[in-house]
Each structure stands twice: as C-alpha cells, then as structure tokens.
C-alpha cells in the first residue's frame, strides 16, 4: 500500500474550466453547481476575473488589478459564487495574468498606463511597466493612416485612441513599428509588467491574494510564466504569499521537464495532452501522410526546415524592435544573435543573473549555439554571444530569455503549425507534428513519474482543435489510402490555395457538421497565421473573397461526401475519443475538463472553442434522458471516472498492465484499472481481439460502465464487448 498523499494545502481532485464572458458571469456559474457536483468535479476553474477591457471575451486584457470584473458580478458576485459552490462541495481556481496588462482603446481605460503616458518616469506607476525610455519617450504604435491626431484640451485624439496632452512622454508611431515596451508576443495592445519588482508584485496581486486569504479562491493558474523576468523568483514569492495549489502555463517540448526549483504544483497539461494524442496515432501512417501532404501543398518533407524558416520570418516581421533592444545589451554580431534565437529548441532557458548557470540551461543554449554556428559564416562569434546571454550583463541575460518564448510561439505555434500539417491532430501547443505515434512502453514510463498534483487536460481555450476533432483525425493515420482517395475526389471538384486546401479538408471532415460561417472564420485565421498568402499585417480582399467562395463550394459540392466519410470512421473515432478521455481522467495528476467536453465537442481554434455551451442538453443527458450514443458514452466515461477519482487516493501508484498492441491498460494502486482500445482500425482489420487477455490485479473488480464483475485473467473480447474502454473499481 502506498502512503496516503498529503499536502499543506487542498489539491483539487479535478477541475472544470469555465470561460467567463459578459453573458456568462458568476451567477450563471453558480447555477451550474448541482450539475458540476453530480458530474464529479471538485473545483471550478475560472478564466481571468480581474477588470478587463469592456466586452472582452477572454479576460487576459486586464485594465485594473484592484477590481473584480463588474460585468461578471464584481466582488460580491464572486463571493456569492464561492459560497454557492462551497455548499455543493466545490472550490474555486482562478486564472491570473502576471505578465501583462492591456493597452486599451481609448488608452484612458488603463489608469496606471495613463499616468505613465502623462507623467513619464515621474509617475508612481512607471516601475510597473517594462518600458524602453531611450530618448525619454515611449513609442506607441497606433498610427494607421494619414489622419492627424487632434488636441482636445488635455487629450490628444486619434480615431478612438486617447492620449494625455501634451505628448511629453510618448510618441505616436506606425502601428507596424515595434513599441517602446515589452509586450505579450507581438501583441502591442498587451504591455509587459515588471512583477519582479516587489512593490509591483504586491500592487498587482493584492486583490487576488486577499481572495485567497478570505477563502474565496482555493488555487491559482498562472498565465505565461515564460514572459516574466525570473519565473522561479515570482513563483517563490507567490507561494509565500498564498500557499495554495498553483499550476503554470508552461509549454514543454519533447523530453523537457518543468524546472525542479519552481515552487508550484505542475503545468496546465499540454505535455500530457500531446503524449496521449500520440498514443492513438499509428506511426505506420507517417510516410504516406507526409507524402500526401507534400503532394498537395508543395511544402518540404522536413518539418525542421519549415520551423527554421518560420522563426526567421517572425523575427524579421514582428520582433525587430525587441532584437534591437536585446542586441544593444548583448553587443557583438546581430546576425549571430538572431540565429541563436532561431535555433533555440524550447521556449526558453532559465538563468538568474549573478547565479551559477544551471547545467540544463547551459546545455540548451550551447546546443542552440552549435546549430546556429553551422548556419553562420565561419568565424562568427557564436561562443561569445552564447556566453553573453548566459553570463553577461543582467539585462542581456533576462532579455534573451524573454524574447525566446515569443519567437517560439509566433514562429512555431502561430506559423509553422499552420504550414506543415500532414496529420493535424499532432499540431498542438507544445506538439511535434513530425513525431507520429507513441510507444506504449514510453508512455507508461512517463506516466509512472507524473506528479499527483500536476494538471492534465485534453482541451483548453488555447488548443488548436478540440479533443474529439483530434480523435477523428487520429483515425487517418490508420487509413492513409482511403483518406488520400477522399481528398483527391474533393480537391478535383473544389480547390483554392495549395498551401491551405489540405488543411481545409482535414478540418472540414474532423469538425463536421460545420457551417460556412465557422468554417470560413477558421480558414481565414489559419491563412493569416500561415502567412504564405495573406497575414494579419498584409490583408488581401481578393484572397478573402476567393476563400469565401471556396468554403461555400466545399460544403455545397463536397459536404455529402465529407459527411459520409466522417460517418464511416465514427466507430474508430469514438473509440479514440473515449480512450483518450479515460486515460486522461485516470492518470496521476489533477484532470481538467474544458467546459462542454464531457460530451462530444467538435470545435476548432479560438474563438470557435469559446462559443457558449449548451448546458441544458448536458443536464438532460446527465439525468439519463437520452441523446446521441457517442455523447452518452463519453458522459458516462467522464462521470464515472471523475467520481471514482473522488474515492481514489491521488498518490495511488501508476501500474502498467500488459494488454497487447491495441490497448493501453494500467492500474491505480489496488482500487482502479483503466483499459482503452487504441489503433481500432488495425484491430478490426485483424479480426478483433482474438485470444488476447489482460491479467487484473488481485481481487474482485467491477466495471463501472457496464456493472460486470471480473477476477483474474479476462479475455479482452469479453471486457471490451460493450464499450471500447473499461473502468474497473476494486471491491
């Protein structure tokens, strides 16, 4: 028997992510309390709750750290929500945004920023913002046409923008020009905060920490820690001030691990998401699907080449000002510095100026230096630049780390993943689309080392596709010939842009049924992110019109065939959907459920995945009033697993169970066993389970999905005859 898991604070059993909006605030969440309790979750996980831009649909554009957002119900509404949830045995997790605030329109909507624009470095809020005061003024990139700003008393107006007048401490520049401040990625409307300053930390966290102390908030999710000057120090200060369960939105690549000295409980789960997805992808599909992709798009076979080109483009397009500022600190050859940034294989390394460089961080940057050196002329000062960003002046060390993340995010997440997509279910945040399939043994080894406090997830507000869209796409790895024939048929009828068409067909099928409005919005965003034909900075009305025509024709002329293909793979997609959901919910860690995904959800990237959720339908299904069989099955798996987790010691060890090539199976201590079908097409083609069996741990077991009871060695054909998954509880 394992020792019971203990922590000095309450660790959620599971969480349910809610996207708060002006239309869905605290009162609406409170009304869900009975449903969520019956579903089995332990905590409601709220999107940002501080005052944000009016009508903001996401809340990451904070305008005032001293107030709870009025549109949601304000502080009293939040307290009432917390009380209602508590009555149902539920807690509250809050999403906090320490890295940035918004530059609103009009700019007077951010009082702290207005003070700085008015009084410059003499403002008491000047230390809040990461501003480059070179020349005594901060660049504000808002000018988009020949209209002249107009002075109106103490205000300078430019269209909807407002600035203090006179313009003593700022200059208005072209909107495409880099701003005079650190920003979130390339988003000039989000200005970086300096929470490394203790006074700034205290001022920007006072309300949130007060809610923690009051017992209204029970845990925290930290947005974008990689933007901070010193994430380790920030998390130490946060833990000292709050001492509650805390997870961080840290994107890990490949075998990268969360720094051991970070005082937090884990990540928000993208690392687990990508490993689970690969479990349900057949590596044998790699070669034919890559060839199919190359044939349709003309893109390279090699993903790494696309990544390098994409990162170079975003550095040149978006980050000239940031690189110039960094180069001023680092010195030496600018091109060497750029190549080092492009070569970084992860979002950033972690070095604290004045402290010894951690071995893992040194290895990351030095390895990137070797890659950069191979691309630069002989004699380029790579070693000197590497040494400066690891051991040089404090600003050089910190600025380098803070720009690595934006280059990776914009170059890979928001460019390369929209250019290289042989199998789009692999194109996720932190994913590696050239890494087809996952080895069961490797997954078991990873799962055995998972922390009981880290978050796991399958869908978030930032995923490129919902879990059920990915479940459908994963089937294509087992049906490359059938998929090639279908795409060939559709493309012969309707085509538009070779760089986009193949992505369009994947997403049209996987998100089916989808109307022309949603489908156009997705492809329009995808085309702008890819930047091969249009971009956010370079729109093209003619291209947009052509895309609208493509969308209409694709649905009108090919919709019936697309629907037929989706229906044909439904048994396999359903198996993938239920399998990945069961695995995620029963792994070590704190499983998060993105709102609405307790049943099927075929959403694409935001804002599509932030649409309102039909909770009356979900209540009806949970009450057993019938519905779509896939929905019923997914809800049953979700509800049974979440409620079993409430009865399970979170420290129950992960024990791999042998189940052959077409199943993933594991026990959680002596109380639970999960079995999920994988690669279902191959299983069907070989004639089913045959004589394969699974040996259950000692004792009597009951399948929570069917009520059947088992002991000892069980034929998989018997165990999985009703559902493609089984969830057993020890009796």
Where are these regions (language model features)?
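Active-site groove signature of glycoside hydrolases
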Residues: 216-225
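Short glycine-biased active-site loop of nucleotidyltransferases that positions the nucleotide triphosphate
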Residues: 54-58, 105
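Catalytic P-loop NTPase motifs of RecA-like helicase/translocase cores
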Residues: 100, 228-229
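Hydrophobic or amphipathic alpha-helical targeting/insertion segments
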Residues: 81-126
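DnaQ-like (DEDDh/DEDDy) 3′-5′ exonuclease domain used for proofreading
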Residues: 116-119, 125-178
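C-terminal reverse transcriptase regions that engage the nucleic-acid substrate
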Residues: 338, 342-346, 507-508
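Carbohydrate-interacting/catalytic domains
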Residues: 1-54, 62, 66-71, 79, ...
């Amino acid at each position: 028997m394992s020792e019971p898991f203990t922590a000095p604070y309450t660790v959620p059993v599971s969480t349910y992510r809610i996207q708060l909006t002006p239309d869905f605030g605290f009162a609406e969440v409170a009304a869900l309390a009975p449903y969520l309790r019956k579903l089995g979750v332990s905590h409601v996980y709220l999107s940002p709750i501080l005052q944000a831009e009016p009508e903001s649909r996401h809340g990451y554009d904070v305008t005032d750290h001293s107030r709870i957002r009025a549109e949601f119900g304000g502080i009293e509404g939040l307290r009432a929500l917390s009380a209602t949830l508590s009555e149902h045995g539920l807690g509250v997790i809050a999403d906090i945004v320490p890295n940035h605030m918004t530059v609103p329109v009009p700019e007077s909507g951010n009082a702290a920023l207005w003070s700085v624009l008015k009084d410059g470095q003499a403002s008491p809020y000047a230390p809040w913002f990461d501003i480059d005061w070179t020349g005594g003024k901060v660049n504000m990139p808002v000018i988009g046409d020949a209209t002249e700003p107009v002075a109106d008393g103490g205000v300078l107006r430019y269209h909807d923008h407002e600035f203090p007048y006179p313009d003593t401490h700022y200059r208005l520049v072209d909107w495409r020009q880099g701003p005079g401040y650190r920003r979130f990625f390339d988003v000039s409307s989000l200005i970086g905060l300096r929470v490394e300053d203790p006074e700034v930390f205290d001022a920007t966290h006072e309300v949130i920490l007060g809610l923690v102390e009051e017992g209204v908030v029970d845990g925290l999710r930290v947005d974008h820690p990689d933007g901070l000057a010193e994430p380790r120090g920030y998390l130490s200060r946060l833990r000292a001030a709050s001492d509650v369960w805390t997870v961080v939105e840290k994107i890990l690549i490949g075998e990268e691990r969360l720094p051991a000295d970070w005082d937090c409980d884990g990540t928000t789960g993208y690392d687990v998401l990508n490993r689970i997805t690969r479990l349900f992808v057949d590596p044998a599909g790699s070669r034919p699907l890559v060839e199919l992709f190359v044939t349709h798009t003309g893109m390279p076979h090699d993903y790494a080449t696309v990544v390098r080109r994409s990162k170079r483009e975003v550095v040149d397009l978006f980050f000239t000002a940031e690189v110039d500022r960094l180069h001023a600190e680092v010195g030496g050859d600018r091109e060497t510095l750029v190549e080092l940034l492009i070569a970084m294989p992860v979002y950033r390394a972690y070095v604290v100026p004045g402290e010894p460089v951690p071995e893992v961080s040194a290895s990351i940057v030095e390895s990137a230096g070797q890659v950069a050196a191979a691309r630069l002329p002989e004699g380029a000062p790579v070693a000197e630049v590497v040494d400066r960003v690891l051991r040089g002046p404090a600003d050089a060390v910190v600025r380098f780390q803070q720009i690595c993340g934006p280059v990776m995010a914009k170059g890979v997440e928001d460019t390369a993943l929209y250019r290289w997509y042989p199998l789009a279910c692999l194109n996720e945040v932190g994913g590696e689309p050239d890494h087809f399939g996952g080895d069961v043994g490797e997954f078991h080894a990873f799962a055995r080392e998972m922390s009981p406090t880290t978050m796991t997830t399958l869908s978030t507000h930032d995923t490129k596709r919902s879990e059920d869209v990915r479940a459908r796409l994963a089937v294509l790895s087992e049906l490359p010939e059938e998929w090639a024939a279908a795409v060939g048929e559709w493309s012969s009828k309707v085509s538009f842009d070779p760089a986009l068409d193949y992505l369009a067909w994947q997403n049209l099928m996987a998100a089916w049924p989808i109307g022309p409005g949603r489908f156009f919005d997705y492809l329009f965003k995808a085309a702008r992110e890819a930047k091969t034909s249009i971009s956010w900075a370079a729109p093209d009305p003619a291209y947009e019109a052509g895309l609208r025509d493509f969308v209409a024709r694709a649905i009108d002329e090919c919709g019936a065939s697309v629907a037929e293909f989706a229906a044909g793979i439904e048994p396999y997609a359903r198996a993938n959907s239920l399998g990945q959901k069961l695995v995620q919910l029963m792994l070590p860690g704190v499983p998060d459920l993105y709102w609405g995904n307790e049943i099927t959800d075929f959403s694409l990237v935001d804002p599509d995945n932030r649409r309102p959720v039909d909770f009356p339908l979900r209540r009806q299904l949970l009450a057993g009033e019938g519905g779509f069989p896939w929905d019923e099955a997914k809800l049953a798996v979700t509800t049974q697993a979440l409620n079993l987790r409430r009865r399970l010691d979170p420290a129950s060890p992960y024990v791999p169970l042998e189940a052959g090539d077409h199943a993933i199976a594991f026990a959680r201590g002596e109380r639970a066993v999960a079995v999920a079908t994988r690669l279902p097409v191959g299983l069907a083609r070989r004639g089913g389970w045959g004589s394969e069996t699974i040996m259950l741990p000692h004792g009597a077991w009951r399948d929570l999905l069917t009520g059947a009871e088992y002991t000892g060695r069980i034929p998989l054909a018997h165990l999985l005859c009703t559902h493609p998954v089984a969830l057993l509880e020890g009796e």
